[in-house]
Every structure is written in structure tokens, then in C-alpha cells.
């Protein structure tokens, strides 16, 4: 009775297997994510009519945010020194000014409408009746900005006076200038020509002008602050006596308020003035602490001002409304913005850039801008075995594996019948590229991010440990699948704190603090020796273990090749650890006079070397010089860059090069992988460009030359490998370098680049190979193993990993391994956080995204069905043949 039903069961099972097929498809971009950041915001404007925020950050960004959720709508790069923006809500234009240019931006789409070159960059932008003017003080020229609804016009005008500033009141414009030691105010007509009588101000000749804005003039004389209103320009009014510092802000409303904060007797005091009948009237005086940020809101209903101030954990609105700020370490408040209209009532920015938006007493949204200060991030290895793979492995290790497999397929069939639309392959096959990312920040926080596309909020956890340490270093201490450990150190001038965390949940496993500043920290990779990895600090030639116990360091001290490198500005030393935990200097190298160390790089200690040589077309082999003790050292000497490759065990120099005409030494970047060193710099010799130098070390200059490996690892190794070197010109400015990494090292190691064009790119190893042959015109290459040499490497579209995205401020690129040899994970940080994956040698161990799995399964099922249908016919034919024969 059951036999006629088995084809139906087989069909359902086959469909189930199709939906849960364990062959991974290369779905490019599925795991990619980007966190768009701003950094610490300097100035902010709230468009209450359209519910938008416009911000200028210290990282050099102008941005438009959605006021309802904080999402970035657009961003544009501006000069980092830009601290203020001017927004005209009527014409929808934004104006920013730096030392060289004035920019007019379209607020709707962020497109630059106009860029105006400034003469000396010492001028100032003033808001006047019907627009803005940019004035260079003590010159007779200014730029009038006429902002219309859909376009802007800039007109350079001459002025008959040596103007100091522009003011406006009652739809009239005025110019302030100085003549014969007197400050004079002169009215102007609509063409900015002198109009009407002038007014001599009651301002001393040696007075310091503090504010000349709109309709007020505030100045100081002999430690006293005075105010003048344009409508009564001949009258100076005493505002504040005895002050040291001065801060000013304007509170908009039907009745403008003027907030002045001074440091009186080392105590901050804020005064609030309004103009009544052309006179300054003091309506509020508040003594507060340095840690308080004070603001006011103009109440339209009763024409009063409500006092608002923020401390580390609270925002307090007068008279008794209190809002709690989620601030773990009670960080100081950097900025407080208050608003009387719109959905947002207050915005608080902490000193690490964290951005809080409040509506009445509710926290509406939060931006984790501390991520913009990421430093030395780490990618945890992807899960070594997915849950589906583990179940299969358990079946293979079982004596009843066949029954277990049928039982598993039967359960999958039941799940499919219950939930046919919700059952997908992801329910039985975890995403092979889902991992966690640990990001320390220079502000003292640690973040954990998830690459899981189902994780809407990428941040799994965040913990604050210290406030703004001077330096941060971090390491992946243990990358075991069950309990990965992450270590980091925060250091100040007179102390440091060392932590070990559980990378899964951020819990603190151990903590140590010392009341001195360490000279250097070292990470010891002991995986190959079946010992736990160790971290130690060095201070005054003494070793301080931060992990493990002294017995492990005693074992390290007994190993002949356990030599560590200590660098100062002018000296490089190699030392071993003695039994009494002191530095035993084995060798020392002094740089030339005037030469200073700027950086050093080493190979990734977890790097797997799959190939010990490079196979040529004729099947001969160039053997790589794979000395694990090599490190690269970069130094500067005047305008020259000096590059060394040294052996840390012997102190010998195996490669040295010098480059002239370096523009900026802080833009020298390098990576070291296997026997391959790649570094970049900007030079004006022979012409200004970005150069990439590729160096590859081999055991000999010819193929099939190989030396004894014992000679390489010896402490008396004086062998100098042969170096192939090529220089390339790159058509972009490079901001950082990285290298891809895979589990077995079989896949090509390509170079990752951060670009000043706000992109993340990758150059194939074949293009950077120093063994590319130099050919004469029309000459054919003898060895097809290498691409003929071309001095310029263009940036092609297929090299860009960030697609059409703008990834701002890329300063670090980190790569991580996956379960698939073809694929590496790529993380870029600096300002934005961008995560993607790439296959340097193509995804050869997974199906293409264009592969038609459905067609394959249907074809296979069709063949099987045809076999089942024709089987009775074949049997009948065989029976007839036997019967009639």
C-alpha cells in the first residue's frame, strides 16, 4: 500500500533539499554594511519647518540629517577648520567659509552651487538685510551674496571706507569703520553706498571688539564689557565688569536674547540680555560649573526665556524638568543646543562625539559618533563550523549515521510542510560570513559590531572604560571558537590600564593598572608552540608580564630566536628576556645623524604560507625568502625616506632603499606579507605623484636556488636575500594600506587601499609584482607568468570595493579570514565604518550568483522522474522479449 506513495515522498524530499542546499552562492554585497559618521559636531542648525538638521563636524564634514531619526541624508567634505555654518531657510542655501574659499551649498541635495576664492582668508561673513556679505577687514572690497530661491549670485563690490564689519537693523545696513582713532558707524543704501550722516561711537581707541553681529556691538575696555545697539549708536552701556574669557551666543525668537558667558574669579557666569527700547536689559544671571553647558529657549507664548543646562548625566529645564542622559562614565558635555520650535527640544553632544536628540523629556535617537575615532580594530574569525555542518559531522562520527541523516531530512520535510514560505536555506545553514568586529576608540570606548545582515542595529554592545586616553593598543589574545578574548591597554603620561575582555559579551575577565607609562607593549604569538599568547610591557629595560605567569616567560627566555625589537627615535635594538625578567640587548643599530624613525611594520603572526616558491612558466621555481623574523623600518632624513628590512634575531639589514623629495612623512604607509613588502609615499621627484614600491625577497637571483632553512633561522644568519624591486605611479592619493588574508594562504594576497577620493580599493598582486618584465616596444614577453611592466597603475572600476559609496576618512584597513579559502573580510575605519568581503582570486569554492540552481534541480528531478516512469515500460518490454523468444 505504501509503495505507490514513495515517489511523492521523494518529490517532497527533493524540493526540501533544493531549498536547503548547503552549496553557498556568492551573493556579493549581502554582508556589506556602512555606518555613516560625522565625528564631533561643532555647529548645528535646526530647520524646524522641514525637520532637518545641518551640522559641521571637527572631522571636516558638512551634513544634513533627518531630525526625526538622525539618519544621514547627505554629507560633503569641507575644511576641518570650518567651525560655523550659515543657513538661509528661505532660499535653502548653506554657506561655509574656510581660510581659502567661501562655499554655497544647496541644502536639498548637498550639491556645491558656488565656490568663491578668498584673497587672504582673514575676512568674515556677515548677515545683512536681504543676504550675506563677506568682508576682508581694512580693505575697500567685499563680496555680496545674493541668494535666490533656486540660484545664487556673488558680486564683488568696492566700498568707500576701510570697513571693520557690517551690521543691520530695521531693514537698513550699516558699516563700522575706524578713522583717526575713533569708531564710526555709517548707514548704507541698497547699493551699499554711503547714505546719510555718520555716528561716532563712544568707544575708546584701544577697545577690543568682541561681537559685531546684526544690530549689536559688544566690546571690552580695561577688563569691562560694554554693549551698543545700532539704533542708539552713540550710547555705550556697561554690561559686565571683570572677566577673563568670553563666549557669546544669540537665542532666536520674536525677541532676541543675547547670552554672554565669562569667567569671573575662575567661576563661569552666564548673563542673558534682551534689547528693550534700544537698551540692554539683564533678565538672567547664572553661576555654574565648568562641567555644565548652559543654554536658553525663547518661549513664544509669554515672551520669556527658559534656562536649560546639561551636565554629564542630566539635562535640566527650568523650573524642575529633568532628562537623564545615558552616559556611562559621566563624560563632559561638549555642546548643548536648545530649540523652542519643532519636534526636537534639545541636542547634547558629549566630548567623545556621542549625539543625543531629545523631544520634551524623551530620548528620540542617538548617534554613536565615538566610532569615528576607531583605532586598531579586530575581526573575529567566522564560526569554524556552522550548526548545519556540525550536525553533519556528528552524523559521520556516529555508527548509525545513515539513520540520523534520514531522521534529519524527515524533520526538515515536516518543517517545510508547516512553513513552506518561511523555510529557507538560512534556517539550516548559518551565514558563512557572519562575524563580530571589535573596535576600540581613542575616546576610551570599546564597541562590538555584527556583520549579520539580519542585525538591524549593528552595535551589539558598547562599554566605556576611560575618558580620552592618550594612546590605545589592542590585540586578539585568544581566537578560540568558544570563548574569544580581546586585550587592550589605555595609557596616559603617568599610568596605564590593561584589560582582557570576553569578546562575545564585553565582560571584563581581568584588569591591571600601573602608575607609570610603559615604553612599549609586545604581543607574543605562541600558538605554534601550544602555549597561550602573551602580552608584556617594557619600562626602563624591565619586562612586566601582563598575561600568564612568570613560568611562561621563562620558557620564552630559553628560546634562542625569541628576540624582540625596541625602537626609539634614533636607535633600533633587539633584546631577549632574561630569567629575571629584564631586557638582555642582543644587538643595536644606530641610525645616521639626522635620521629619525617614523614607523615599523611586521608580518601578521597568524599568516599561513601555502607556497614556498613562485613557479615560473618553464616549471622552475623562485624560492621565497620566508624568514619569519623580518620587519620593515621607515625613517626620515631631511626630505628623504629611508627604508630598511631587518632581521630581528641578528639585527642584520637584508634590504635598504632611499627615496628623495618626500612631501609628507605622515603619509607613508606599508604592508609586509610573506616575502613581500609594499609601501607608498608622495614625492615630487621627478614630479609630484603617489608612488607605490613593491619589494619581493627571494633566496637567490635565479630560479631553483635554495639555501638551507637552518641557516635562515640561525642566530648567526648573515645571508642577504636577493630583492626584486619595482616602482609604480598611482593616480590617487593613498590614505592607508592593508593586505588580504585567507585561512590557508592559497588565494592571492592583494593589497587593500584607502583613497583620498573616499573609496576602498584593491590592487591585484599580479599588478604589483616586482618581477613584471620590462619590455622594449613590440617585444614579446618570454615568460607569460607575469604581466609586462607598466609604470602607471590606473584605478579601474573593478578595483573599487566600496562600489558607488563614499567612505569618508579611511585611515585603517583590516582583513579577516572566513570559512572559504577564496574569500577575505575587509573592514575600513577612520571616520566611517565600512565592511565588505572580496575574493582576490575569484570565488572558486562557491557557486556564482548567476548559477541557476533551480534549473539544475528541476533537470535532475526530471531525469529521475523519467527513469521512474520508463522503468515499468522497460520491464514490460523485457518480459515480452522473454515470452515471445
From Swiss-Prot:
Annotated compartments: Endoplasmic reticulum membrane
Q: According to its record, how does it sit in the membrane?
A: Single-pass type I membrane protein
The record's function comment reads: Part of the endoplasmic reticulum membrane protein complex (EMC) that enables the energy-independent insertion into endoplasmic reticulum membranes of newly synthesized membrane proteins. Preferentially accommodates proteins with transmembrane domains that are weakly hydrophobic or contain destabilizing features such as charged and aromatic residues. Involved in the cotranslational insertion of multi-pass membrane proteins in which stop-transfer membrane-anchor sequences become ER membrane spanning helices.
Q: Which residues lie on this side of the membrane: Cytoplasmic?
A: 875-885
What is one GO biological process annotated to this record? protein insertion into ER membrane
| Recorded family membership | Belongs to the EMC1 family.
Output this protein's name: ER membrane protein complex subunit 1
Record text on subunit structure and interactions: Component of the ER membrane protein complex (EMC).
Q: InterPro entries, alphabetically? A: EMC1, EMC1_C, Quinoprotein_ADH-like_sf
Membrane-traversing stretches: 856-874
Q: Which interval of the chain is the signal sequence?
A: 1-22
Keyword line: Endoplasmic reticulum, Glycoprotein, Membrane, Signal, Transmembrane, Transmembrane helix
The record's Gene Ontology cellular component field reads: EMC complex; endoplasmic reticulum
Which residues face the membrane's Lumenal side?
A: 23-855
According to the record, glycans are attached at 66, 302, 397, 502, 526, 687
Q: Which SUPFAM superfamilies match?
A: Quinoprotein alcohol dehydrogenase-like (SSF50998)
Amino acid at each position: 500500500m505504501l509503495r505507490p506513495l514513495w515517489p511523492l515522498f521523494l518529490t517532497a524530499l527533493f524540493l526540501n533539499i533544493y531549498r536547503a542546499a548547503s552549496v553557498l552562492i556568492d551573493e556579493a554585497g549581502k554582508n556589506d554594511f556602512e555606518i555613516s559618521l560625522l565625528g564631533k559636531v561643532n555647529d548645528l542648525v535646526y530647520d524646524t519647518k522641514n525637520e532637518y538638521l545641518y551640522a559641521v563636524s571637527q572631522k571636516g564634514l558638512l551634513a544634513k540629517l533627518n531630525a526625526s531619526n538622525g539618519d544621514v541624508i547627505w554629507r560633503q567634505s569641507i575644511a576641518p577648520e570650518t567651525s560655523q555654518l550659515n543657513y538661509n531657510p528661505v532660499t535653502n542655501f548653506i554657506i561655509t567659509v574656510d581660510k581659502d574659499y567661501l562655499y554655497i551649498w544647496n541644502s536639498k541635495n548637498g550639491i556645491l552651487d558656488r565656490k568663491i576664492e578668498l584673497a587672504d582668508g582673514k575676512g568674515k561673513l556677515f548677515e545683512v538685510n536681504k543676504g550675506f556679505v563677506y568682508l576682508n577687514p581694512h580693505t575697500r572690497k567685499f563680496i555680496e551674496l545674493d541668494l535666490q530661491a533656486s540660484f545664487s549670485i556673488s558680486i564683488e563690490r568696492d566700498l568707500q571706507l576701510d570697513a571693520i564689519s557690517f551690521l543691520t537693523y530695521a531693514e537698513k545696513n550699516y558699516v563700522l569703520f575706524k578713522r583717526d582713532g575713533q569708531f564710526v558707524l555709517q548707514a548704507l543704501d541698497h547699493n551699499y553706498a554711503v547714505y546719510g550722516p555718520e555716528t561716532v561711537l563712544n568707544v575708546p581707541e584701544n577697545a577690543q571688539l568682541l561681537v559685531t553681529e546684526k544690530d549689536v556691538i559688544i566690546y571690552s575696555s580695561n577688563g569691562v564689557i560694554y554693549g551698543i545697539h545700532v539704533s542708539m549708536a552713540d550710547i555705550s552701556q556697561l554690561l559686565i565688569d571683570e572677566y577673563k574669557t568670553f563666549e557669546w551666543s544669540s537665542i532666536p525668537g520674536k525677541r532676541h536674547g543675547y547670552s554672554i558667558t565669562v569667567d569671573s574669579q575662575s567661576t563661569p557666569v552666564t548673563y542673558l540680555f534682551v534689547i528693550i527700547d534700544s537698551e540692554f536689559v539683564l533678565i538672567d544671571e547664572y553661576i555654574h560649573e565648568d562641567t555644565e553647558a548652559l543654554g536658553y529657549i525663547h518661549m513664544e507664548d509669554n515672551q520669556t526665556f527658559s534656562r536649560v543646562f546639561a551636565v554629564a548625566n542630566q539635562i535640566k529645564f527650568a523650573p524642575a524638568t529633568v532628562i537623564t542622559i545615558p552616559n556611562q562614565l559621566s563624560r563632559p558635555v561638549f555642546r548643548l543646543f536648545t530649540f523652542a520650535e519643532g519636534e526636537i527640544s534639545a541636542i547634547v553632544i558629549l566630548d567623545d562625539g556621542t549625539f543625543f536628540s531629545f523631544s520634551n523629556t524623551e530620548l528620540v535617537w542617538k548617534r554613536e559618533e565615538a566610532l569615528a575615532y576607531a583605532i586598531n580594530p579586530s575581526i573575529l574569525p567566522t564560526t569554524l563550523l556552522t550548526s548545519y555542518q556540525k550536525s553533519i559531522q556528528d552524523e559521520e562520527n556516529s555508527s548509525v549515521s545513515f539513520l540520523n541523516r534520514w531522521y534529519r531530512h524527515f524533520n526538515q520535510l515536516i518543517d517545510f510542510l508547516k512553513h513552506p514560505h518561511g523555510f529557507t536555506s538560512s534556517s539550516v545553514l548559518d551565514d558563512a560570513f557572519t562575524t563580530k568586529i571589535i573596535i576600540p576608540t581613542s575616546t576610551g570606548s570599546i564597541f562590538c559590531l555584527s556583520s549579520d545582515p539580519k542585525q538591524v542595529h549593528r552595535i551589539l554592545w558598547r562599554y566605556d572604560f576611560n575618558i580620552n586616553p592618550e594612546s590605545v593598543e589592542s590585540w586578539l589574545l585568544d581566537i578560540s571558537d568558544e570563548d574569544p578574548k580581546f586585550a587592550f591597554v589605555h595609557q596616559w603620561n603617568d599610568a596605564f590600564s590593561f584589560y582582557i575582555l570576553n569578546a562575545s559579551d564585553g565582560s571584563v575577565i581581568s584588569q591591571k593598572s600601573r602608575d607609570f607609562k610603559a615604553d612599549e607593549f609586545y604581543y607574543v604569538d605562541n600558538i605554534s608552540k601550544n602555549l597561550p599568547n602573551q602580552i608584556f610591557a617594557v619600562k626602563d629595560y624591565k619586562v612586566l608580564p601582563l598575561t600568564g605567569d612568570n613560568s611562561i616567560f621563562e620558557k620564552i627566555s630559553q628560546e634562542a630566536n625569541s628576540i624582540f625589537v625596541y625602537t626609539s627615535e634614533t636607535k633600533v635594538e633587539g633584546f631577549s628576556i632574561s630569567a629575571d625578567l629584564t631586557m638582555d640587548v642582543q644587538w643595536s643599530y644606530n641610525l645616521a645623524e639626522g635620521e629619525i624613525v617614523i614607523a615599523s611594520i611586521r608580518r601578521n603572526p597568524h599568516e599561513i604560507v601555502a607556497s614556498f616558491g613562485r613557479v615560473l612558466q618553464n616549471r622552475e621555481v623562485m624560492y621565497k625568502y620566508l624568514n619569519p623574523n623580518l620587519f620593515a623600518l621607515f625613517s626620515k632624513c631631511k626630505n628623504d625616506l629611508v627604508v630598511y628590512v631587518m632581521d630581528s634575531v641578528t639585527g642584520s639589514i637584508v634590504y635598504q632603499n632611499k627615496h628623495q623629495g618626500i612631501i609628507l612623512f605622515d603619509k607613508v604607509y606599508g604592508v609586509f606579507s610573506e616575502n613581500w613588502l609594499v609601501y607608498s609615499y608622495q614625492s615630487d621627484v621627478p614630479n609630484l605623484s603617489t608612488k607605490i614600491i613593491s619589494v619581493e625577497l627571494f633566496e637567490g637571483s635565479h630560479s631553483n636556488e635554495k639555501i638551507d632553512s637552518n641557516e635562515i633561522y640561525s642566530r648567526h644568519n648573515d645571508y642577504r636575500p636577493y630583492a626584486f624591486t619595482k616602482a609604480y605611479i598611482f593616480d590617487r592619493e593613498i590614505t592607508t594600506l592593508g593586505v588580504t588574508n585567507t585561512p590557508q594562504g592559497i588565494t592571492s594576497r592583494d593589497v587593500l587601499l584607502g583613497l583620498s577620493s573616499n573609496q576602498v580599493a584593491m590592487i591585484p598582486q599580479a599588478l604589483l609584482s616586482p618581477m613584471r618584465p620590462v619590455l622594449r616596444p613590440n617585444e614579446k614577453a618570454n615568460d607569460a607568468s607575469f604581466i609586462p611592466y607598466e609604470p602607471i597603475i590606473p584605478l579601474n572600476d573593478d578595483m573599487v570595493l566600496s562600489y558607488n559609496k563614499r567612505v569618508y576618512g579611511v585611515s585603517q584597513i583590516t582583513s579577516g579570514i572566513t570559512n572559504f579559502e577564496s574569500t577575505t573580510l575587509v573592514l575600513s575605519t577612520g571616520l566611517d565604518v565600512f565592511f565588505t568581503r572580496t575574493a582576490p582570486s575569484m570565488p572558486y569554492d562557491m557557486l556564482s550568483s548567476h548559477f541557476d540552481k533551480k534549473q539544475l534541480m528541476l533537470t535532475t528531478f526530471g531525469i529521475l522522474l523519467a527513469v521512474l516512469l520508463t522503468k515499468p515500460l522497460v520491464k514490460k518490454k523485457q518480459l515480452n522479449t522473454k515470452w515471445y523468444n
